[in-house]
Swiss-Prot record:
GO terms for molecular function: acyltransferase activity, transferring groups other than amino-acyl groups. Keywords: Acyltransferase, Transferase. SUPFAM superfamilies: Acyl-CoA N-acyltransferases (Nat). Belongs to the acetyltransferase family. This is Uncharacterized N-acetyltransferase YdgE. It comes from the Bacteria. InterPro entries: Acyl_CoA_acyltransferase, GNAT_dom, N-acetyltransferase_domain. Residues 3-157 form the N-acetyltransferase domain. It holds the Pfam family Acetyltransf_1. Its EC number is 2.3.1.-.
């Protein structure tokens, strides 16, 4: 099965951004980083800081993952700065819609991303994944990603 990465339209980007802000808030609540009260506001602010010009923010790429039947399978947000000293691109967000999960398609989509990142001048890819997202951690390790940092927390009260 072949995949393509197609630029999101402005409307698709706005829907993606809304979903992403909500998801980032939820992930930070689950990880214990933010409280429910502050999570949405902090998530919204983080997105404003990362992509102040929305879809047109410099060196940010927002793609729909599409299969060879033209079905939208998921999304991908990549930051690739050609001037990065280590030629490292960063995956801010990647996911498949529910109907396409659990079929090995994420691996194929990530291979498509590898090719596109190389075309953009990247020599390596980095990402952040929340530790509680064990499925994603396993996928990324299987695809050759290695842990570079581990942040730990101990609850005292």
């Amino acid at each position: 099965m072949a995949f393509t990465l197609e630029d999101m339209t402005e409307e698709e980007f706005e829907a993606f951004r809304g979903m992403s802000v909500q998801n980032f808030a939820k992930q930070n609540i689950t990880s214990g980083t933010w409280t429910e009260k502050e999570a949405f506001e902090k998530s919204e602010q983080a997105y404003e800081n990362m992509i102040p010009n929305g879809r047109d923010s410099s060196n940010h790429y927002f793609w729909n993952i599409t299969n060879d039947q033209g079905e939208r399978m998921g999304w991908l947000w990549l930051y690739a700065d050609p001037l990065h000293p280590q030629k490292e691109a960063f995956i801010y967000s990647f996911g498949l819609y529910e109907a396409f999960r659990g079929k090995g398609l994420a691996q194929l989509a990530l291979q498509t991303l590898d090719e596109r990142a190389r075309e953009l001048g990247a020599e390596r890819l980095a990402l952040h994944v929340f530790a509680h997202n064990e499925t994603a951690v396993y996928l990324y390790q299987k695809m050759g990603y290695a842990m570079t940092n581990i942040r730990m927390r101990k609850q005292l009260c």
